[in-house]
């Protein structure tokens, strides 16, 4: 992924000021000034400030981090983890959907089916991928690929990053709710192991449709919820400005969801979030995925499906 000019969130202002000071000093050093000790001192101060800040993020701040425009996306993880990736297109019923990436490749030498939502990173790509909000044909494409992988005994990896399924009129006319339900059903019926990773946002049924997996992992600063904080605030308080309060009450964070048993693993992010060191985050995620598939490898197909179904039934009974 390209190294764009760093974008700071509102709450990162203290770190932004220190980084700006470091850049100024480096410019002076380039002109021959010997200020290496001062630069080192401020760099240490910036690292400490960043560590303290990210160790105490509120749920709303984590939501902002999960949406960071420079956070690595689905295609970045595919590029970093998958070899011989061959994308497949179309749902064989209506059209293709660029919001839902799908195909086959190799993960650490073994065949894998990859399904994931792509938000895009530029204006052009965001429009192309519809900001990661899949339409019915995207979920039907996912079902087609899951069925294909299941027939050939190929493991499935889901990379989740969406604000939710697309709520447009056309999507509703083409059966958005049914498509999401069928995709969730397809996940539950798989006899091959599937692993899901919440990379950034896990928005409602749009995320669950490909995240109903044997193992569900979340990045440390990702969020996963039935509704966005802004949406919940608008419904509960008729005031979208109460999003911060809504985020706290929704329990959207990986830490909350791990405590409730909804997800299995929290993947630690580099200091300052995944967007500050995408390569490191992608490598960490790859190691966790490999471990999850290794743990599931000894299970026979019937047990793989039974354990997955029982897992989600238990969540419903425990929290319902």
Swiss-Prot record:
InterPro entries: Acetyl_CoA_COase_a_su, ClpP/crotonase-like_dom_sf, COA_CT_C. One of its GO terms (biological process) is fatty acid biosynthetic process. It catalyses: N(6)-carboxybiotinyl-L-lysyl-[protein] + acetyl-CoA = N(6)-biotinyl-L-lysyl-[protein] + malonyl-CoA. The keyword Lipid metabolism applies. Pfam families: ACCA (PF03255). Residues 42-295 form the CoA carboxyltransferase C-terminal domain. It comes from the Bacteria. GO terms for cellular component: acetyl-CoA carboxylase complex. It is found in: Cytoplasm. One of its GO terms (molecular function) is acetyl-CoA carboxylase activity. Disulfide bonds: none annotated. Keywords: ATP-binding, Cytoplasm, Fatty acid biosynthesis, Fatty acid metabolism, Lipid biosynthesis, Lipid metabolism, Nucleotide-binding, Transferase. Belongs to the AccA family. Acetyl-CoA carboxylase is a heterohexamer composed of biotin carboxyl carrier protein (AccB), biotin carboxylase (AccC) and two subunits each of ACCase subunit alpha (AccA) and ACCase subunit beta (AccD). This is Acetyl-coenzyme A carboxylase carboxyl transferase subunit alpha. It comes from Afipia carboxidovorans (strain ATCC 49405 / DSM 1227 / KCTC 32145 / OM5) (Oligotropha carboxidovorans).
């Amino acid at each position: 992924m390209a190294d764009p000019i760093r974008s700071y969130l509102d709450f990162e202002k203290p770190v932004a000021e220190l980084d700006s000071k470091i850049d100024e000093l480096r410019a002076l050093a380039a002109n021959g000034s010997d200020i290496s000790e001062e630069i080192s001192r401020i760099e240490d101060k910036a690292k400490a400030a960043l560590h303290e800040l990210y160790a105490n993020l509120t749920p709303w701040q984590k939501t902002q981090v999960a949406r960071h425009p420079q956070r690595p996306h689905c295609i970045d993880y595919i590029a970093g983890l998958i070899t011989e990736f061959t994308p497949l297109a179309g749902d064989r019923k209506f059209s293709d959907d660029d919001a839902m990436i799908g195909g086959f490749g190799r993960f650490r030498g073994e065949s894998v089916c990859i399904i994931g939502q792509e938000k895009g990173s530029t204006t052009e790509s965001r429009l192309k991928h519809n900001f990661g909000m899949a339409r019915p044909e995207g979920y039907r494409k996912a079902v087609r690929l899951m069925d294909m992988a299941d027939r050939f005994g190929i493991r499935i990896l889901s990379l989740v990053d969406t604000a939710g399924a697309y709520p447009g009129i056309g999507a509703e006319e083409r059966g958005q709710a049914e498509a999401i339900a069928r995709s969730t059903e397809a996940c539950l019926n798989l006899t091959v192991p599937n692993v899901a990773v919440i990379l950034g946002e896990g928005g409602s049924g749009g995320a669950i449709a490909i995240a109903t997996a044997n193992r569900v992992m979340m990045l440390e600063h990702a969020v996963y919820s039935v509704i966005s904080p802004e949406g919940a605030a608008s419904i509960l308080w008729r005031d979208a400005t109460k999003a911060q309060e809504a985020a706290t009450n929704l329990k959207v964070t990986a830490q909350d969801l791990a405590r409730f048993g909804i997800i299995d693993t929290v993947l630690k992010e580099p200091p300052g979030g995944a967007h500050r060191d995408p390569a490191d985050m992608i490598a960490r995620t790859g190691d966790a995925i490999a471990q999850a598939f290794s743990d599931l490898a000894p299970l026979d197909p019937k047990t793989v499906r039974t354990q997955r179904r029982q897992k989600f039934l238990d969540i419903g009974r425990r929290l319902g």
